[in-house]
Amino acid sequence: MALHRSAGADSQSPVILIFDGEVWARHGLIGAVEQAVRAGDLAPVHLVLLDSGGRERRWRELDGTEPIHRYVAEALLPWLRAEHGLDPAPARTCAVGQSLGGLASLLCGLLAPRVVGAVVSQSASLWQEAPARALAELLERDGAQALADSRFVLEVGDQEWVLTGPHDDFARELRRSPARVEYLRYDGGHDYACWRGSLIPALVRLYPAD
């Protein structure tokens, strides 16, 4: 794990949890975030780049069978508070991921909304049923009132044929909840070029500079 603080970030500044953080470090995410902050577009943030640990560990931890939301809520965020003094409101804690990381981000937002109040999910592996199942249970229980203050940004490329249908279905069901939902489809595929191009704008929409 790596932690990067933007200039001007304080204990209440947004915390952005990035799955597959070591990959994003290679793709220049820190520099792109800093450029957006310096330009006055993005509020100062704390980037928490979570290492995937390799292919096998990534599949084991992010495929929806492990309770990743519990790790985030019960271990990671308390550690960031105790060791680094980061104590943002839930609305200022955002889980970000792509593919399996997108699936994990959705589970954090659905199952731990008291601490993770925002999600940016790009090309989530929604052929896995865990997010749809979790959302269905929330809707059946009480109309997913736990998501009343939550925000979700969902993105998928039109060339990701296996994912567009599940994303359409998931977005439709998520809009039955009180959460604020932004669903974007773009002409692209399952790759970092597409994801990077839309990630910074998504963060700016969630956390614009004052």
Protein language model annotation of sequence segments:
Residues 1-210:
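Non-catalytic cap/lid and distal C-terminal segments of serine-dependent acyl enzymes
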